[in-house]
Amino acid sequence: MFLLYEYDIFWAFLIISSLIPILAFFISGVLAPISKGPEKLSSYESGIEPMGNAWLQFRIRYYMFALVFVVFDVETVFLYPWAMSFDVLGVSVFIEALIFVLILIVGLVYAWRKGALEWS
């Protein structure tokens, strides 16, 4: 039988973890100063007077390179616990991890062929 009271701790955790950021944003909005002068709206560069426009546009290749890095960084985060418990998990989990790695390799080959990894 499906018992809902077994999930009371989950719902309490979900509600509390949702209320904390909402409450933090609300409190910072209430306590923040309202008037913002031109000095507050200028960019801050370590106490030095800013030279030129602070807003500059980056090329898309930097974002693509960062995206590929994040994908493989997340892959490492997922594969490390799997490697530590490889002997306990069995063959089915090995096959799932192999499929996961193969999908990432296909993505890497796609990014490589599209030129996302070329720096020049």
Curated annotation (Swiss-Prot):
Reactions that this protein is recorded to catalyse? a plastoquinone + NADH + (n+1) H(+)(in) = a plastoquinol + NAD(+) + n H(+)(out); a plastoquinone + NADPH + (n+1) H(+)(in) = a plastoquinol + NADP(+) + n H(+)(out)
Keywords assigned by UniProt, alphabetized: Chloroplast, Membrane, NAD, NADP, Plastid, Plastoquinone, Quinone, Thylakoid, Translocase, Transmembrane, Transmembrane helix, Transport
Q: What is its main location?
A: plastid
The protein depicted here goes by the name NAD(P)H-quinone oxidoreductase subunit 3, chloroplastic
GO BP? photosynthesis, light reaction
Indicate whether Manganese appears among the record's keywords. no
Q: What does this protein do?
A: NDH shuttles electrons from NAD(P)H:plastoquinone, via FMN and iron-sulfur (Fe-S) centers, to quinones in the photosynthetic chain and possibly in a chloroplast respiratory chain. The immediate electron acceptor for the enzyme in this species is believed to be plastoquinone. Couples the redox reaction to proton translocation, and thus conserves the redox energy in a proton gradient.
Listed under GO cellular component are: chloroplast thylakoid membrane; NADH dehydrogenase complex
What Pfam families is this protein classified in?
Oxidored_q4
Where does it reside?
Answer: Plastid, Chloroplast thylakoid membrane
In which organism is this protein found?
Answer: Panax ginseng (Korean ginseng)
Query: According to the entry, what is the taxonomic lineage of the organism?
Result: Eukaryota, Viridiplantae, Streptophyta, Embryophyta, Tracheophyta
